[in-house]
Protein backbone atom coordinates (compact mmCIF):
# COMPACT_ATOMS: atom_id res chain seq x y z
CA UNK A 1 0.00 0.00 0.00
CA UNK A 2 2.84 2.35 0.92
CA UNK A 3 4.56 1.35 -2.32
CA UNK A 4 1.43 2.20 -4.35
CA UNK A 5 1.08 5.59 -2.69
CA UNK A 6 4.73 6.24 -3.34
CA UNK A 7 4.36 5.41 -7.04
CA UNK A 8 1.29 7.62 -7.33
CA UNK A 9 3.09 10.46 -5.56
CA UNK A 10 6.00 10.17 -7.95
CA UNK A 11 3.68 10.06 -10.99
CA UNK A 12 1.36 12.83 -9.80
CA UNK A 13 3.38 15.72 -11.27
CA UNK A 14 3.45 13.96 -14.66
CA UNK A 15 -0.28 13.19 -14.54
CA UNK A 16 -1.11 16.76 -13.61
CA UNK A 17 1.19 18.05 -16.34
CA UNK A 18 -0.42 15.72 -18.90
CA UNK A 19 -3.89 16.85 -17.85
CA UNK A 20 -2.92 20.53 -18.05
CA UNK A 21 -1.36 19.90 -21.45
CA UNK A 22 -4.60 18.27 -22.60
CA UNK A 23 -6.59 21.30 -21.44
CA UNK A 24 -4.19 23.64 -23.22
CA UNK A 25 -4.37 21.64 -26.45
CA UNK A 26 -8.17 21.57 -26.20
CA UNK A 27 -8.36 25.36 -25.85
CA UNK A 28 -5.86 25.94 -28.65
CA UNK A 29 -7.75 23.51 -30.91
CA UNK A 30 -10.98 25.40 -30.23
CA UNK A 31 -9.37 28.76 -30.96
CA UNK A 32 -7.73 27.40 -34.13
CA UNK A 33 -11.09 26.14 -35.43
CA UNK A 34 -12.87 29.32 -34.38
CA UNK A 35 -10.32 31.55 -36.10
CA UNK A 36 -11.86 34.97 -36.82
CA UNK A 37 -15.56 34.28 -36.21
CA UNK A 38 -17.38 35.51 -33.06
CA UNK A 39 -17.67 33.22 -30.06
CA UNK A 40 -16.37 32.83 -26.50
CA UNK A 41 -12.61 33.26 -26.20
CA UNK A 42 -12.45 30.62 -23.44
CA UNK A 43 -14.66 27.53 -23.07
CA UNK A 44 -14.97 25.31 -19.96
CA UNK A 45 -12.73 22.23 -20.23
CA UNK A 46 -14.05 18.94 -21.66
CA UNK A 47 -17.79 19.65 -21.47
CA UNK A 48 -17.58 23.11 -22.99
CA UNK A 49 -20.78 25.10 -22.56
CA UNK A 50 -23.05 22.02 -22.42
CA UNK A 51 -24.23 22.84 -18.89
CA UNK A 52 -25.38 26.30 -20.00
CA UNK A 53 -27.21 24.71 -22.94
CA UNK A 54 -29.03 22.10 -20.83
CA UNK A 55 -29.81 24.55 -18.00
CA UNK A 56 -31.32 27.25 -20.23
CA UNK A 57 -31.47 26.37 -23.95
CA UNK A 58 -33.34 29.57 -24.82
CA UNK A 59 -30.68 31.89 -23.39
CA UNK A 60 -27.89 29.79 -24.89
CA UNK A 61 -29.24 29.94 -28.44
CA UNK A 62 -30.33 33.58 -28.11
CA UNK A 63 -26.76 34.44 -27.19
CA UNK A 64 -25.42 32.47 -30.17
CA UNK A 65 -27.81 34.34 -32.45
CA UNK A 66 -26.94 37.78 -31.10
CA UNK A 67 -23.23 36.96 -31.32
CA UNK A 68 -23.76 36.11 -35.01
CA UNK A 69 -25.71 39.31 -35.70
CA UNK A 70 -23.02 41.00 -37.79
CA UNK A 71 -20.97 38.15 -39.26
CA UNK A 72 -23.89 35.77 -39.83
CA UNK A 73 -22.26 32.97 -37.84
CA UNK A 74 -20.75 32.26 -34.42
CA UNK A 75 -18.83 29.50 -32.65
CA UNK A 76 -18.99 27.51 -29.41
CA UNK A 77 -17.92 24.18 -27.90
CA UNK A 78 -20.11 21.35 -26.53
CA UNK A 79 -18.74 18.12 -24.99
CA UNK A 80 -15.72 17.81 -27.23
CA UNK A 81 -17.54 19.11 -30.30
CA UNK A 82 -16.79 22.39 -32.01
CA UNK A 83 -20.05 23.98 -33.22
CA UNK A 84 -20.92 26.76 -35.65
CA UNK A 85 -24.26 28.57 -35.43
CA UNK A 86 -25.52 30.09 -38.69
CA UNK A 87 -27.85 33.06 -38.56
CA UNK A 88 -27.62 34.29 -42.17
CA UNK A 89 -30.15 32.75 -44.59
CA UNK A 90 -27.83 32.50 -47.58
CA UNK A 91 -25.18 30.78 -45.48
CA UNK A 92 -27.84 28.34 -44.26
CA UNK A 93 -28.69 27.55 -47.88
CA UNK A 94 -25.09 26.55 -48.45
CA UNK A 95 -25.53 23.89 -45.79
CA UNK A 96 -28.97 22.63 -46.93
CA UNK A 97 -27.89 22.51 -50.59
CA UNK A 98 -24.73 20.53 -49.87
CA UNK A 99 -26.07 17.53 -47.95
CA UNK A 100 -24.01 14.74 -49.49
CA UNK A 101 -21.29 12.28 -48.40
CA UNK A 102 -18.46 14.69 -49.19
CA UNK A 103 -19.92 17.86 -47.63
CA UNK A 104 -22.57 17.92 -44.87
CA UNK A 105 -24.52 15.14 -43.16
CA UNK A 106 -27.93 15.90 -41.64
CA UNK A 107 -27.98 14.54 -38.07
CA UNK A 108 -31.28 15.87 -36.65
CA UNK A 109 -29.85 16.11 -33.13
CA UNK A 110 -26.35 17.05 -31.86
CA UNK A 111 -25.87 13.40 -30.82
CA UNK A 112 -28.35 11.96 -33.30
CA UNK A 113 -26.52 8.80 -34.40
CA UNK A 114 -26.18 7.66 -30.80
CA UNK A 115 -29.84 8.40 -30.16
CA UNK A 116 -31.47 7.23 -33.40
CA UNK A 117 -28.99 4.63 -34.62
CA UNK A 118 -27.14 4.60 -37.95
CA UNK A 119 -29.98 3.28 -40.12
CA UNK A 120 -32.21 6.29 -40.41
CA UNK A 121 -33.74 8.25 -43.30
CA UNK A 122 -32.00 11.47 -42.31
CA UNK A 123 -28.59 9.78 -42.70
CA UNK A 124 -29.24 8.47 -46.23
CA UNK A 125 -27.72 9.87 -49.42
CA UNK A 126 -27.94 9.38 -53.16
CA UNK A 127 -29.91 6.50 -54.65
CA UNK A 128 -30.75 4.99 -51.24
CA UNK A 129 -32.33 8.27 -50.17
CA UNK A 130 -34.13 8.76 -53.50
CA UNK A 131 -35.45 5.18 -53.40
CA UNK A 132 -36.97 5.62 -49.94
CA UNK A 133 -38.48 9.02 -50.85
CA UNK A 134 -40.07 7.42 -53.90
CA UNK A 135 -41.55 4.74 -51.64
CA UNK A 136 -43.06 7.48 -49.48
CA UNK A 137 -44.88 9.21 -52.36
CA UNK A 138 -48.10 7.10 -52.05
CA UNK A 139 -48.41 8.27 -48.43
CA UNK A 140 -49.24 11.84 -49.45
CA UNK A 141 -51.55 11.54 -52.45
CA UNK A 142 -54.91 13.39 -52.32
CA UNK A 143 -56.65 10.09 -51.50
CA UNK A 144 -54.25 9.38 -48.64
CA UNK A 145 -54.48 12.93 -47.25
CA UNK A 146 -58.28 12.68 -47.36
CA UNK A 147 -58.14 9.47 -45.32
CA UNK A 148 -55.84 11.10 -42.77
CA UNK A 149 -58.05 14.20 -42.57
CA UNK A 150 -61.01 12.14 -41.38
CA UNK A 151 -58.89 10.38 -38.76
CA UNK A 152 -57.37 13.66 -37.60
CA UNK A 153 -60.77 15.27 -37.08
CA UNK A 154 -62.08 12.34 -35.05
CA UNK A 155 -59.09 12.55 -32.70
CA UNK A 156 -59.16 16.35 -32.48
CA UNK A 157 -62.87 16.42 -31.61
CA UNK A 158 -62.48 13.75 -28.93
CA UNK A 159 -59.67 15.68 -27.25
CA UNK A 160 -61.37 19.08 -27.48
CA UNK A 161 -64.39 17.64 -25.69
CA UNK A 162 -62.15 16.18 -22.98
CA UNK A 163 -60.30 19.47 -22.54
CA UNK A 164 -63.48 21.48 -22.15
CA UNK A 165 -64.92 18.89 -19.78
CA UNK A 166 -61.88 19.12 -17.50
CA UNK A 167 -62.20 22.88 -16.87
CA UNK A 168 -65.23 22.83 -14.56
CA UNK A 169 -67.37 24.82 -16.97
CA UNK A 170 -64.56 27.19 -17.88
CA UNK A 171 -63.83 28.32 -14.32
CA UNK A 172 -60.49 26.53 -14.05
CA UNK A 173 -57.54 27.22 -16.38
CA UNK A 174 -55.66 24.36 -18.01
CA UNK A 175 -52.15 24.15 -19.41
CA UNK A 176 -52.41 22.84 -22.95
CA UNK A 177 -48.83 21.65 -23.45
CA UNK A 178 -49.28 18.09 -22.20
CA UNK A 179 -52.85 17.91 -23.53
CA UNK A 180 -51.74 18.89 -27.03
CA UNK A 181 -48.86 16.43 -26.84
CA UNK A 182 -51.33 13.65 -25.99
CA UNK A 183 -53.61 14.75 -28.83
CA UNK A 184 -50.73 14.65 -31.31
CA UNK A 185 -49.43 11.32 -30.07
CA UNK A 186 -52.85 9.73 -30.53
CA UNK A 187 -53.19 11.43 -33.93
CA UNK A 188 -49.80 10.06 -35.02
CA UNK A 189 -50.61 6.57 -33.79
CA UNK A 190 -54.03 6.61 -35.48
CA UNK A 191 -52.91 8.12 -38.78
CA UNK A 192 -49.63 6.24 -39.10
CA UNK A 193 -50.49 2.73 -37.89
CA UNK A 194 -54.26 2.87 -37.29
CA UNK A 195 -55.64 -0.52 -36.29
CA UNK A 196 -52.30 -2.21 -35.69
CA UNK A 197 -51.68 -0.91 -32.15
CA UNK A 198 -53.82 -2.39 -29.38
CA UNK A 199 -54.46 -0.55 -26.10
CA UNK A 200 -51.52 -2.16 -24.30
CA UNK A 201 -49.16 -1.35 -27.17
CA UNK A 202 -50.39 2.26 -27.22
CA UNK A 203 -49.65 2.65 -23.51
CA UNK A 204 -46.14 1.20 -23.93
CA UNK A 205 -45.67 3.47 -26.92
CA UNK A 206 -46.65 6.53 -24.88
CA UNK A 207 -44.24 5.59 -22.08
CA UNK A 208 -41.34 4.99 -24.47
CA UNK A 209 -41.97 8.20 -26.38
CA UNK A 210 -41.93 10.21 -23.15
CA UNK A 211 -38.59 8.57 -22.27
CA UNK A 212 -37.28 9.57 -25.69
CA UNK A 213 -38.48 13.14 -25.21
CA UNK A 214 -36.74 13.49 -21.86
CA UNK A 215 -33.52 11.96 -23.14
CA UNK A 216 -33.34 14.17 -26.20
CA UNK A 217 -32.91 17.18 -23.89
CA UNK A 218 -30.37 15.56 -21.55
CA UNK A 219 -26.58 15.30 -21.51
CA UNK A 220 -25.47 12.43 -23.81
CA UNK A 221 -24.46 10.00 -21.04
CA UNK A 222 -25.28 6.55 -22.42
CA UNK A 223 -25.38 4.61 -19.14
CA UNK A 224 -28.20 2.83 -17.26
CA UNK A 225 -30.23 5.24 -15.18
CA UNK A 226 -29.33 8.28 -17.29
CA UNK A 227 -32.06 9.89 -19.40
CA UNK A 228 -30.06 9.77 -22.66
CA UNK A 229 -29.38 6.05 -22.33
CA UNK A 230 -33.03 5.37 -21.50
CA UNK A 231 -34.04 7.39 -24.57
CA UNK A 232 -31.75 5.41 -26.89
CA UNK A 233 -33.23 2.12 -25.68
CA UNK A 234 -36.76 3.55 -25.97
CA UNK A 235 -36.09 4.45 -29.63
CA UNK A 236 -35.11 0.84 -30.31
CA UNK A 237 -38.31 -0.46 -28.70
CA UNK A 238 -40.44 2.08 -30.59
CA UNK A 239 -38.89 1.02 -33.89
CA UNK A 240 -39.54 -2.64 -33.09
CA UNK A 241 -43.19 -1.91 -32.25
CA UNK A 242 -43.67 0.01 -35.50
CA UNK A 243 -41.93 -2.78 -37.42
CA UNK A 244 -44.52 -5.26 -36.13
CA UNK A 245 -47.24 -2.89 -37.39
CA UNK A 246 -45.56 -2.82 -40.82
CA UNK A 247 -45.64 -6.62 -41.00
CA UNK A 248 -49.35 -6.72 -40.12
CA UNK A 249 -50.09 -4.06 -42.72
CA UNK A 250 -48.20 -5.95 -45.43
CA UNK A 251 -50.31 -9.03 -44.77
CA UNK A 252 -53.53 -7.01 -44.90
CA UNK A 253 -52.58 -5.17 -48.11
CA UNK A 254 -51.44 -8.42 -49.75
CA UNK A 255 -54.96 -9.74 -49.07
CA UNK A 256 -56.34 -6.88 -51.18
CA UNK A 257 -57.97 -4.83 -48.42
CA UNK A 258 -58.39 -1.05 -48.63
CA UNK A 259 -55.82 1.23 -46.93
CA UNK A 260 -57.00 2.68 -43.61
CA UNK A 261 -53.86 4.57 -42.49
CA UNK A 262 -50.46 5.78 -43.67
CA UNK A 263 -48.64 2.47 -43.28
CA UNK A 264 -51.33 0.81 -45.42
CA UNK A 265 -50.79 3.22 -48.33
CA UNK A 266 -47.06 2.63 -48.02
CA UNK A 267 -47.26 -1.17 -47.79
CA UNK A 268 -49.85 -1.37 -50.58
CA UNK A 269 -47.27 0.10 -52.96
CA UNK A 270 -44.48 -2.12 -51.63
CA UNK A 271 -46.33 -5.44 -51.88
CA UNK A 272 -47.30 -4.54 -55.46
CA UNK A 273 -43.61 -4.43 -56.44
CA UNK A 274 -41.73 -7.57 -57.46
CA UNK A 275 -39.07 -7.81 -56.23
CA UNK A 276 -39.72 -5.62 -53.22
CA UNK A 277 -37.65 -2.40 -53.16
CA UNK A 278 -34.60 -1.85 -50.92
CA UNK A 279 -35.17 -0.79 -47.31
CA UNK A 280 -38.63 -2.38 -47.20
CA UNK A 281 -38.04 -4.96 -44.46
CA UNK A 282 -40.29 -4.70 -41.41
CA UNK A 283 -37.48 -3.54 -39.13
CA UNK A 284 -36.30 -0.84 -41.53
CA UNK A 285 -39.87 0.33 -42.13
CA UNK A 286 -40.30 0.56 -38.36
CA UNK A 287 -37.25 2.82 -38.11
CA UNK A 288 -38.50 5.02 -40.94
CA UNK A 289 -41.92 5.26 -39.30
CA UNK A 290 -40.23 6.46 -36.13
CA UNK A 291 -38.57 9.19 -38.22
CA UNK A 292 -42.06 10.30 -39.26
CA UNK A 293 -43.28 10.19 -35.69
CA UNK A 294 -40.32 12.21 -34.42
CA UNK A 295 -40.76 14.79 -37.20
CA UNK A 296 -44.54 15.08 -36.74
CA UNK A 297 -45.09 14.73 -33.03
CA UNK A 298 -43.18 17.52 -31.33
CA UNK A 299 -43.27 19.88 -34.30
CA UNK A 300 -47.07 19.70 -34.40
CA UNK A 301 -47.29 20.11 -30.63
CA UNK A 302 -45.28 23.31 -30.92
CA UNK A 303 -47.37 24.68 -33.80
CA UNK A 304 -50.72 23.95 -32.15
CA UNK A 305 -49.64 25.65 -28.92
CA UNK A 306 -48.39 28.74 -30.74
CA UNK A 307 -51.58 28.83 -32.83
CA UNK A 308 -53.68 29.12 -29.66
CA UNK A 309 -51.25 31.65 -28.17
CA UNK A 310 -51.23 33.87 -31.25
CA UNK A 311 -54.98 33.65 -31.91
CA UNK A 312 -55.60 34.77 -28.33
CA UNK A 313 -53.30 37.77 -28.75
CA UNK A 314 -54.72 38.66 -32.20
CA UNK A 315 -58.55 38.87 -31.80
CA UNK A 316 -59.03 40.30 -35.29
CA UNK A 317 -57.26 37.30 -36.81
CA UNK A 318 -59.36 34.94 -34.66
CA UNK A 319 -62.60 36.63 -35.79
CA UNK A 320 -61.60 36.34 -39.46
CA UNK A 321 -60.83 32.64 -39.01
CA UNK A 322 -64.20 32.02 -37.35
CA UNK A 323 -66.05 33.94 -40.06
CA UNK A 324 -64.32 32.03 -42.85
CA UNK A 325 -64.85 28.61 -41.28
CA UNK A 326 -68.53 29.37 -40.53
CA UNK A 327 -69.16 30.09 -44.23
CA UNK A 328 -67.67 26.75 -45.23
CA UNK A 329 -68.40 24.26 -42.44
CA UNK A 330 -71.02 24.06 -39.69
CA UNK A 331 -70.60 21.87 -36.60
CA UNK A 332 -74.38 21.41 -36.66
CA UNK A 333 -74.06 19.51 -39.93
CA UNK A 334 -72.43 16.62 -38.03
CA UNK A 335 -70.26 16.22 -41.13
CA UNK A 336 -66.50 16.01 -41.32
CA UNK A 337 -64.65 18.85 -43.01
CA UNK A 338 -63.97 17.58 -46.54
CA UNK A 339 -60.69 18.09 -48.36
CA UNK A 340 -62.49 20.47 -50.74
CA UNK A 341 -63.77 22.52 -47.80
CA UNK A 342 -60.28 22.49 -46.30
CA UNK A 343 -58.91 23.89 -49.56
CA UNK A 344 -61.49 26.72 -49.40
CA UNK A 345 -60.20 27.86 -45.98
CA UNK A 346 -57.54 30.06 -47.55
CA UNK A 347 -57.25 32.62 -44.76
CA UNK A 348 -57.10 29.89 -42.10
CA UNK A 349 -54.32 28.22 -44.10
CA UNK A 350 -52.50 31.58 -44.25
CA UNK A 351 -52.80 31.79 -40.46
CA UNK A 352 -51.31 28.30 -40.16
CA UNK A 353 -48.40 29.20 -42.44
CA UNK A 354 -47.77 32.40 -40.50
CA UNK A 355 -47.76 30.46 -37.21
CA UNK A 356 -45.05 28.22 -38.68
CA UNK A 357 -43.06 31.19 -39.99
CA UNK A 358 -43.38 33.25 -36.82
CA UNK A 359 -42.61 30.34 -34.50
CA UNK A 360 -40.90 27.56 -36.51
CA UNK A 361 -41.11 24.46 -34.27
CA UNK A 362 -37.61 23.12 -34.87
CA UNK A 363 -35.58 26.30 -34.74
CA UNK A 364 -32.35 24.72 -35.98
CA UNK A 365 -31.41 21.77 -38.19
CA UNK A 366 -28.04 20.35 -37.08
CA UNK A 367 -25.58 18.95 -39.63
CA UNK A 368 -22.02 17.69 -39.32
CA UNK A 369 -19.24 18.72 -41.72
CA UNK A 370 -17.70 15.69 -43.47
CA UNK A 371 -14.88 17.82 -44.91
CA UNK A 372 -13.26 21.20 -44.43
CA UNK A 373 -15.93 23.31 -46.15
CA UNK A 374 -15.23 26.88 -47.37
CA UNK A 375 -18.39 28.68 -46.20
CA UNK A 376 -17.24 32.24 -46.91
CA UNK A 377 -14.20 33.86 -48.46
CA UNK A 378 -12.68 34.25 -45.01
CA UNK A 379 -13.89 31.18 -43.09
CA UNK A 380 -13.72 27.43 -43.69
CA UNK A 381 -15.80 25.15 -41.47
CA UNK A 382 -13.45 22.46 -40.09
CA UNK A 383 -14.22 18.78 -40.67
CA UNK A 384 -16.24 17.28 -37.80
CA UNK A 385 -17.91 20.57 -36.85
CA UNK A 386 -21.58 20.40 -35.86
CA UNK A 387 -23.30 23.16 -37.82
CA UNK A 388 -26.62 24.68 -36.73
CA UNK A 389 -28.42 26.57 -39.54
CA UNK A 390 -31.12 28.63 -37.81
CA UNK A 391 -34.48 28.46 -39.58
CA UNK A 392 -35.84 30.67 -36.79
CA UNK A 393 -33.51 33.53 -37.68
CA UNK A 394 -34.23 33.08 -41.39
CA UNK A 395 -37.95 33.53 -40.67
CA UNK A 396 -37.21 37.09 -39.51
CA UNK A 397 -35.15 38.04 -42.56
CA UNK A 398 -36.53 39.34 -45.85
CA UNK A 399 -40.24 39.30 -45.00
CA UNK A 400 -42.18 42.57 -44.76
CA UNK A 401 -42.23 43.65 -41.09
CA UNK A 402 -41.00 40.18 -40.05
CA UNK A 403 -41.52 40.81 -36.32
CA UNK A 404 -45.25 41.28 -36.89
CA UNK A 405 -47.70 38.35 -36.91
CA UNK A 406 -49.41 38.97 -40.25
CA UNK A 407 -51.20 36.05 -41.99
CA UNK A 408 -52.03 38.27 -44.98
CA UNK A 409 -48.40 38.04 -46.07
CA UNK A 410 -49.36 34.57 -47.41
CA UNK A 411 -52.42 35.85 -49.31
CA UNK A 412 -52.74 35.46 -53.08
CA UNK A 413 -52.19 39.22 -53.37
CA UNK A 414 -48.90 39.48 -51.48
CA UNK A 415 -47.53 35.94 -51.91
CA UNK A 416 -44.60 36.48 -49.57
CA UNK A 417 -44.20 32.70 -49.39
CA UNK A 418 -42.98 32.95 -53.01
CA UNK A 419 -41.30 36.36 -52.88
CA UNK A 420 -39.28 35.37 -49.80
CA UNK A 421 -39.30 31.63 -50.43
CA UNK A 422 -35.62 31.29 -49.53
CA UNK A 423 -36.33 32.63 -46.03
CA UNK A 424 -39.22 30.24 -45.30
CA UNK A 425 -37.14 27.26 -44.15
CA UNK A 426 -39.36 25.73 -41.46
CA UNK A 427 -39.80 22.60 -43.62
CA UNK A 428 -36.17 22.53 -44.64
CA UNK A 429 -34.64 22.91 -48.09
CA UNK A 430 -32.90 20.72 -50.62
CA UNK A 431 -32.91 16.89 -50.82
CA UNK A 432 -34.01 16.43 -47.21
CA UNK A 433 -36.92 18.87 -47.30
CA UNK A 434 -39.83 17.60 -45.17
CA UNK A 435 -41.76 15.02 -47.20
CA UNK A 436 -44.85 15.33 -44.98
CA UNK A 437 -45.32 19.09 -45.00
CA UNK A 438 -48.78 18.98 -46.64
CA UNK A 439 -49.94 16.55 -43.95
CA UNK A 440 -48.48 18.75 -41.20
CA UNK A 441 -50.07 21.91 -42.59
CA UNK A 442 -53.46 20.20 -43.00
CA UNK A 443 -53.29 19.06 -39.37
CA UNK A 444 -52.66 22.61 -38.18
CA UNK A 445 -55.44 24.06 -40.36
CA UNK A 446 -57.94 21.45 -39.12
CA UNK A 447 -57.00 22.13 -35.51
CA UNK A 448 -57.30 25.92 -35.90
CA UNK A 449 -60.66 25.58 -37.67
CA UNK A 450 -62.16 23.19 -35.11
CA UNK A 451 -60.63 24.73 -31.97
CA UNK A 452 -61.71 28.27 -32.86
CA UNK A 453 -65.19 27.18 -33.99
CA UNK A 454 -66.05 24.84 -31.12
CA UNK A 455 -64.41 26.58 -28.15
CA UNK A 456 -64.10 30.01 -26.59
CA UNK A 457 -60.71 30.49 -24.95
CA UNK A 458 -58.75 33.09 -23.05
CA UNK A 459 -55.13 32.97 -21.93
CA UNK A 460 -54.30 33.18 -18.25
CA UNK A 461 -51.57 35.71 -18.77
CA UNK A 462 -48.54 35.87 -16.49
CA UNK A 463 -45.11 37.50 -16.59
CA UNK A 464 -43.07 35.97 -19.39
CA UNK A 465 -45.85 33.60 -20.48
CA UNK A 466 -45.05 34.17 -24.17
CA UNK A 467 -41.32 33.61 -23.79
CA UNK A 468 -39.87 30.70 -25.74
CA UNK A 469 -38.80 27.47 -24.03
CA UNK A 470 -37.38 24.32 -25.63
CA UNK A 471 -39.12 21.00 -24.87
CA UNK A 472 -37.54 19.90 -27.29
CA UNK A 473 -39.31 22.01 -29.94
CA UNK A 474 -40.29 25.52 -28.86
CA UNK A 475 -43.43 26.36 -26.91
CA UNK A 476 -44.76 29.22 -24.74
CA UNK A 477 -43.14 29.35 -21.32
CA UNK A 478 -46.43 28.90 -19.45
CA UNK A 479 -47.41 25.84 -21.49
CA UNK A 480 -50.22 27.92 -23.03
CA UNK A 481 -52.51 28.11 -20.00
CA UNK A 482 -56.08 28.99 -20.98
CA UNK A 483 -59.67 29.12 -19.81
CA UNK A 484 -61.88 27.03 -22.10
CA UNK A 485 -65.63 26.92 -22.64
CA UNK A 486 -67.89 25.53 -25.33
CA UNK A 487 -69.16 28.07 -27.90
CA UNK A 488 -71.59 25.78 -29.75
CA UNK A 489 -74.91 24.36 -28.59
CA UNK A 490 -73.58 20.85 -29.05
CA UNK A 491 -70.50 19.21 -30.47
CA UNK A 492 -70.74 17.62 -33.92
CA UNK A 493 -71.43 13.91 -34.06
CA UNK A 494 -69.02 12.40 -36.59
CA UNK A 495 -70.04 8.80 -36.01
Swiss-Prot record:
Annotated tissue distribution: Expressed in the vascular tissues of roots, shoots and leaves. Expressed in root tips and sepals. Very low expression in stems and siliques.
Induction notes from the record: By infection with Pseudomonas syringae.
Residues in the signal sequence: none
Keyword Oxidoreductase assigned: yes
Compartments reported by the entry: Membrane
Keywords: Heme, Iron, Lipid biosynthesis, Lipid metabolism, Membrane, Metal-binding, Monooxygenase, NADP, Oxidoreductase, Steroid biosynthesis, Steroid metabolism, Sterol biosynthesis, Sterol metabolism, Transmembrane, Transmembrane helix
EC numbers, comma separated: 1.14.19.41
GO BP, one annotated term: sterol biosynthetic process
Membrane association type: Single-pass membrane protein
Source organism, top-level taxon: Eukaryota
GO cellular component labels: membrane
Chain segments annotated as transmembrane: 5-25
InterPro entries given in the database record: Cyt_P450, Cyt_P450_CS, Cyt_P450_E_grp-I, Cyt_P450_sf
GO function term, MF aspect, one: iron ion binding
Metabolic or biological pathway: Steroid biosynthesis; sterol biosynthesis
Phenotype upon loss of function: No visible phenotype under normal growth condition, but upon infection with P.syringae, no accumulation of stigmasterol and increased resistance to the pathogen.
Catalysed reactions, semicolon-separated: 5-dehydroepisterol + NADPH + O2 + H(+) = ergosta-5,7,22,24(28)-tetraen-3beta-ol + NADP(+) + 2 H2O
Residues annotated as binding heme: 434
Names of the cofactor(s): heme
Family per record: Belongs to the cytochrome P450 family.
Functional summary from the UniProt entry: No activity with campesterol.
Other remarks in the entry: Plants overexpressing CYP710A1 show higher levels of stigmasterol and lower levels of beta-sitosterol than the wild-type.
Designated name of the protein: Cytochrome P450 710A1
High-level lineage: Eukaryota, Viridiplantae, Streptophyta, Embryophyta, Tracheophyta
Amino acid sequence: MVFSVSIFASLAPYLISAFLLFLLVEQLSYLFKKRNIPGPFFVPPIIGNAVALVRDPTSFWDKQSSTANISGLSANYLIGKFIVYIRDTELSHQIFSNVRPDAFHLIGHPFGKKLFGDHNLIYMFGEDHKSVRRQLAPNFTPKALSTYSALQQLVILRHLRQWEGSTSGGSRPVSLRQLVRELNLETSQTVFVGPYLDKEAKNRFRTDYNLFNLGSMALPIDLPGFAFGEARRAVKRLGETLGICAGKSKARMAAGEEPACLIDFWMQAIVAENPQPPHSGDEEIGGLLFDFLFAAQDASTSSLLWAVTLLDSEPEVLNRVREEVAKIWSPESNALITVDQLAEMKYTRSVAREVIRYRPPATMVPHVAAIDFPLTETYTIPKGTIVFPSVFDSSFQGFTEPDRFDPDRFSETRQEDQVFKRNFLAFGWGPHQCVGQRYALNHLVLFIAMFSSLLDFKRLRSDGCDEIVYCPTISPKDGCTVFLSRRVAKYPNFS
